[in-house]
Amino acid sequence: MKEKAAETMEIPEGIPKDLEPKHPTLWRIIYYSFGVVLLATITAAYVAEFQVLKHEAILFSLGLYGLAMLLHLMMQSLFAFLEIRRVNKSELPCSFKKTVALTIAGYQENPEYLIKCLESCKYVKYPKDKLKIILVIDGNTEDDAYMMEMFKDVFHGEDVGTYVWKGNYHTVKKPEETNKGSCPEVSKPLNEDEGINMVEELVRNKRCVCIMQQWGGKREVMYTAFQAIGTSVDYVQVCDSDTKLDELATVEMVKVLESNDMYGAVGGDVRILNPYDSFISFMSSLRYWMAFNVERACQSYFDCVSCISGPLGMYRNNILQVFLEAWYRQKFLGTYCTLGDDRHLTNRVLSMGYRTKYTHKSRAFSETPSLYLRWLNQQTRWTKSYFREWLYNAQWWHKHHIWMTYESVVSFIFPFFITATVIRLIYAGTIWNVVWLLLCIQIMSLFKSIYACWLRGNFIMLLMSLYSMLYMTGLLPSKYFALLTLNKTGWGTSGRKKIVGNYMPILPLSIWAAVLCGGVGYSIYMDCQNDWSTPEKQKEMYHLLYGCVGYVMYWVIMAVMYWVWVKRCCRKRSQTVTLVHDIPDMCV
C-alpha cells in the first residue's frame, strides 16, 4: 500500500508542493476504514475475554487482547531493529554545500546548561561559512540579559550580532502609538517595525546572532528565528537552550535530508544530560532511549516519525516557510495553541506528504526534570499536545504508510484499556487478581527491558522495567487530567531558574490512588469472607505466597542494582566526563 501511494507522488522541484496521492478521497476511505476495523477488532477481543492460553494449575491465562499487545511489541521491536541496522550499514555522503541555520530557543535557562549548549554549538563540525547560529531569548528584561552576555563570551571573536528588541513579530501597538485613522489588529505582524528590519538584517548578514525580545512563549521565539531566516538557508536545525550537541549532530542530519528529496524533516537521538541527579532523571534517561531507539526508529522504518524532538531536529527550510504562518496561528477549540510546538511542526511536514526520519547517528544531550512535580508537569504538557495533534495527524493518514494509521490507533486506545483492566482486576474481589496484575506488569516490563539490553548492548536497560510503576501510578492518571484540561494552555513549564509551583497534576494522582486503594481493600475484604480451608483456596494461598515472594524479591534485586550500579559506580564515573562525545552510552 505504501508503494502504491508513493508511485502517485512527484519528487518536489523548486517550490515544495502539497503531495496528494491520486484519488485522495478513496485513500481516505481505505485508511479510515482500516482504523475503524482495527479499533473494533481490538475492542471486541478485549470485551469478549477470549482466552488463548489457560492453565488452571498455576492460575495463568492469556487473553486475545493480551496476545495482540504482545504481537504489537514484537513487531515494533523488529522494525526498530531493522531500521537501526539499515542506518548502521549505510554510509551516506555529505556534500557540505547546504547552508544550515542552527536556531536555539531560550527562556531563563540555567547558566550551567546554557554555557554547555552554546559551547557545543560553537564546536559543531560543519563548515563555518555554511552554518549560522541564532539564539532567540524569550524575554528582554534585566533578568534575561545574562543569556546574551554568555552568548557574547562564548562567541567572542566570531562574526557576532546582538539586538535587544522591545517587541516581537506580533507585538500589538497601543492606540496612542497608532497613526490617526488607522485600526490596529490583534496579533498582526508589524511589517514596518524597525525592530523587524534590524533582526532580519542581523540574522541574514551575521553568522552568530543573539536576539532578546518581548516575552511571548516558545512558539513566538521559534517564529522569530524562522521568519528572520527567510529563504537565506537550505535547512533549519532546532535546539533548546538546555541541550548539548554532539560534534556530528548537524552533519548526520544533513546527510539524511540530502539523501532523499522526499524527506522533509529528520530527528536525532536525544539522551539525558543529567541522568544521575535523581531516580526520576535516571528513569527518564532509560525511557528516552526506548522512545527514540525503539519507538521512533520503528516509525522511521516507515518514513513517518510522529514528532521531531525540539532539542535535536532539522527541517527543509523551503517546506517550513510554506506553513510557517499556519503553524504559528494554530488554534484548538478557538484558543491559540501554546503547547506542542515541535509535534505540530512535524505534523505540518507530514500533512504536505513529505517523509520524516530518525537517525541515531545524530546525538544530543538534554536536561530533564529531576524533581517529581516538574517531571509530572512536563509529561502532562506533552500528553495534552499528543491528544490534540492526534486529531490533526489523523487527517493525513492517507498520505503515508498504513503503519502510521495502525500505530496511531493502538497507541491512542492503549491507556484506556490498561485503565479498564486495572480497575476490573482490583475490584474482582480476589487478592490473587491484584497480585497477578502486579506480576504481569513487571513481567511484561522485564521482557521489554531484556530486549532493550540486547539492542543497546548494555545491561543497565534491565532497570527500565522499573519505569512501569512510574507509568501506572503517575503517567496513566495524568493522561486523563491532560484530556480533561486539553484547552487549558496556561499550565506549562517555567524557566530552569524558577521552581515549578503548579500542583494541579497532583489531583488526578490522588483520585487514582484512592481508586486503587479502594479496589485493593475491597478485594481483601471479599476474599476474607471466603472459606480458605477448601482445596482450591489452599492452592491459591500457595500461589499468593510464591507470587508475593517473587514480587518482593524482584524489587529488592532492582533496588540493589540501582543503588550499587547507578548511585555509586555510575555517578562517580560521570563526574570525570568533560566533553559531550566522552559521555558514556551508560555505565557498564
From Swiss-Prot:
Regions that span the bilayer: 29-49, 62-82, 412-432, 434-454, 457-477, 506-526, 544-564
Catalytic reaction equation(s): [hyaluronan](n) + UDP-N-acetyl-alpha-D-glucosamine = N-acetyl-beta-D-glucosaminyl-(1->4)-[hyaluronan](n) + UDP + H(+); N-acetyl-beta-D-glucosaminyl-(1->4)-[hyaluronan](n) + UDP-alpha-D-glucuronate = [hyaluronan](n+1) + UDP + H(+)
Record Gene3D superfamilies: Spore Coat Polysaccharide Biosynthesis Protein SpsA, Chain A
Main location as per UniProt: membrane
Transport keyword on record: no
Cofactor: Mg(2+)
Annotated metabolic or biological route of this protein: Glycan biosynthesis; hyaluronan biosynthesis
Topology feature Extracellular, residues: 50-61, 433, 478-505, 565-588
Gene Ontology cellular component annotations, sorted alphabetically: plasma membrane
Entry keyword Disulfide bond: no
Gene Ontology process terms (BP): extracellular matrix assembly; hyaluronan biosynthetic process; polysaccharide biosynthetic process
Top EC class of this enzyme: transferase
Tissue expression remark: Expression moves as a gradient through the embryo. The mRNA is first expressed in the animal region of the blastula, and by early gastrula is found everywhere except in the outer layer of the dorsal blastopore lip. By mid-gastrula, protein is present in the inner ectodermal layer and the endoderm, then disappears from dorsal ectoderm as the neural plate is induced and later decays in a dorsoventral direction. Last expressed in ventral regions of the gut at the tailbud stage (at protein level).
Side of membrane Cytoplasmic, spans: 1-28, 83-411, 455-456, 527-543
Keywords recorded for this protein, A-Z: Glycosyltransferase, Membrane, Transferase, Transmembrane, Transmembrane helix
Membrane topology summary: Multi-pass membrane protein
Protein's cellular compartments: Membrane
EC number: 2.4.1.212
S-S bridge residues: none
InterPro entries per record: Nucleotide-diphossugar_trans
Molecular-function GO term, any one: hyaluronan synthase activity
Family that this chain belongs to: Belongs to the NodC/HAS family.
Job of this protein: Catalyzes the addition of GlcNAc or GlcUA monosaccharides to the nascent hyaluronan polymer. Therefore, it is essential to hyaluronan synthesis a major component of most extracellular matrices that has a structural role in tissues architectures and regulates cell adhesion, migration and differentiation. Also able to catalyze the synthesis of chito-oligosaccharide depending on the substrate.
Annotated protein name in UniProt: Hyaluronan synthase 1
High-level lineage: Eukaryota, Metazoa, Chordata, Craniata, Vertebrata
